[in-house]
Swiss-Prot record:
The keyword Phosphoprotein is assigned to this record: no
Name by which UniProt lists this protein: Maturase K
Chief site of localization: plastid
UniProt cross-references to InterPro entries, sorted A to Z: Domain_X, Maturase_MatK, Maturase_MatK_N
Biological process per Gene Ontology, one example term: RNA splicing
One GO molecular-function entry: RNA binding
Function text: Usually encoded in the trnK tRNA gene intron. Probably assists in splicing its own and other chloroplast group II introns.
Subcellular location: Plastid, Chloroplast
Keywords on record: Chloroplast, mRNA processing, Plastid, RNA-binding, tRNA processing
Amino acid sequence: MEEFKRYLELDRSQQHDFIYPLIFQEYIYALAHDRGLNGSIFFENSGYDNKSSLLIVKRLITHLITQMYQQNHFLFYTNDFNPNKFLRCNTNLYYQMIFEGFVVVVEIPFYLRLLSFLEGKERVKSHNLRSLHSIFPFLEDKFSHLNSLLDILIPHPVHLEILVQTLRYWVKDPSSLHLLRFFLHEYPNWNSLITPKKSSFSFSKRNQRFLFFLYNFHLCEYESIFIFLRNQSSHLCSISSEIFLERISFYKKKDLEEVFTKDLTAILWVFKDPYMHYCRYRGKSILASKDSCLLMNKWKYYLVNFWECYFYIWSQPRRIHINQLSNNSLDFLGYLLSVRLKPSMVRSQMIENSCIIENASKQFDTLVPITPLFRSLSKAKFCNMLGHPISKPVWAASSDSDIIERFGRIYRNLSHYHSGSLKKISLYRIKYILRLSCARTLARKHKSTVRSFLKRLGVGLLEEFFTEEEQVFYLTFPKASSTSGKLYQRRIWYLDIFCINDPANHE
């Protein structure tokens, strides 16, 4: 986005929020293909104006129409030559060229709003806040004072037209929205790009950026209701929410203004809660409160109705679970989160009498879910379904140092991510599985038994390699067990973790 500061020159049409003319700018396609103006894929005459080049897009569209025409009317080829496959590839290429430039154009209004919002304000850049572990200190500080929460699976739109309807509140240019509809309906195999497969989206790598943009915009619109209710019910309004609530018109029909004003007080009274906390990662969010389950149940059915009325998404109530933190655990970001009572006894001795005072304090607890880890290791062929280590014959062709380095890297990644748990017994079992699987892989390579191979190699080599740690920045808290000088007995949150490492991805 930094290139926009250099290349973006808005004329009068863009000042009126018309972004369609930007499609005819050459630098848009240069930015889309991560190239400078000198390395552009387009070639113009030396005397031609590069600022507004209609010939660029016209050339692409001409090629596109020509190829589509030839694909439908070439009927006189022999059986040895199939032109449709070749022409279809070229058609997809021209579609892709125009589409990638259009992706950059659609992102410009949001980038300009961000620049105007940050203008004159000091912006603190901290890459540590991008770490997945940065959310756990917040949960550790807040969840011990809360009673119940909503475990929410955010539904995704069943049709991309819903995203276009939502996007029109931000993009005021009808021509750009019509062009977006054209790509969504005419792009080859477009429907397969967002088809759910095994609880995840099957994204094309080249279109991944735009699909993530649409999906994140959908999540942003979903979260705007929390910001709106919070700002209306609290005097401490969130400054960062100004960007999200800037709309053309929040309510279109004037007839609804009186009804909305009349019912707003009742709605805010129902959902007013000074101890409401919200966090989200991808399509899963948590809404926690200090109040009873009655308020959580109201929030549950309110969200279901909100999705159906605003996003036209039918969502089952079972996608939202009401969870009591003191009774159940929550599976979130690879941890089992819970709040348990920690009893403590204080004996008071007076002159003649003594008494024992029993007290219980809430403590935020994080555990490592061992069953999903076993399932992931079994999927990656490091162990069977029962957790018994097996060899990795696919890696047997590599060198000994490469095999040991692969197994050690997987364990260090898992240990690094799950360092926030005080109970490390699960990590010890994972370490045992990977060490023995590594030993069996090496023994299989050298056609020997595990016992004789370890006797010749020495167990200390594997032990030293698996316990090797990198120097990274981490957070520890006084509330953790700090009586022992050993670091592994503390709860540690690292600030360099940007994704969840799955052993199945280390193929």
